[in-house]
Every structure is written in structure tokens, then in C-alpha cells.
Amino acid sequence: MGVPAGDVEKGKKIFVQRCAQCHTVEAGGKHKVGPNLHGLFGRKTGQAAGFAYTNANKAKGITWQDDTLFEYLENPKKYIPGTKMIFAGLKKPNERGDLIAYLKSATK
């Protein structure tokens, strides 16, 4: 299954409700419990400068893009065993598509 086309506004609401307590998206945004996500697309796992990643995250070696984020966001601990991201995931494909659409627009 491909990544469903997402709605940026719905994705923003999901980000605010489920992600913003640990992540920022703006250029120059600070790291919180999780890394700043600016420049996420096209970056390899564990590469945000100044953030202390687990070895598992650094070693995963995939590049963040629509399809890898779609799989990761369903169940982060299954996709990267040993990640410190304490998020159960988004089980609904349309919600993951919405969040990815928002992240693509907000992290450029």
C-alpha cells in the first residue's frame, strides 16, 4: 500500500495533539525530548545535529521520506527497536498520511 495523500491542516492538528510536546519543526527550533524535525525529509535516521540519539536510531541507516515515515509512524518501536521515542504510533493510514503531508510542508 502506498502513502495516502494527506491533508496538511488535519496533519497539523495531529502534530499539535500527538507530537509537539516532544518535537519542534521550525528552522532553528530547539530539541525537546525528541529532535527538531526541520529538514527531516532526505535526512538519515539519527542525524539531527546536537541531539543525543540511541545507537539503534543511528544504526538504522534509512533515509526519511514518505514511505519510511509511513511505516515508522505506525509503530516506531517495531521499526527501530531501541528507539527512545515513547509513542505508540498512528494505526490509521489516513492519519499517517495527514501527518506526513503536514511534516513535508512544515519542515522544509
Swiss-Prot record:
Sequence positions that bind heme c: 19, 22-23, 85
Protein localization: Mitochondrion intermembrane space
Record's comment on post-translational modification: Binds 1 heme c group covalently per subunit.
Name of the featured protein: Cytochrome c
UniProt family annotation: Belongs to the cytochrome c family.
Gene3D superfamilies: Cytochrome c-like domain
Keyword terms: Electron transport, Heme, Iron, Metal-binding, Mitochondrion, Respiratory chain, Transport
GO cellular component: mitochondrial intermembrane space
Protein function: Electron carrier protein. The oxidized form of the cytochrome c heme group can accept an electron from the heme group of the cytochrome c1 subunit of cytochrome reductase. Cytochrome c then transfers this electron to the cytochrome oxidase complex, the final protein carrier in the mitochondrial electron-transport chain.
Taxonomic source organism: Haematobia irritans
Signal peptide location: none
GO MF terms held by the record: electron transfer activity; heme binding; metal ion binding
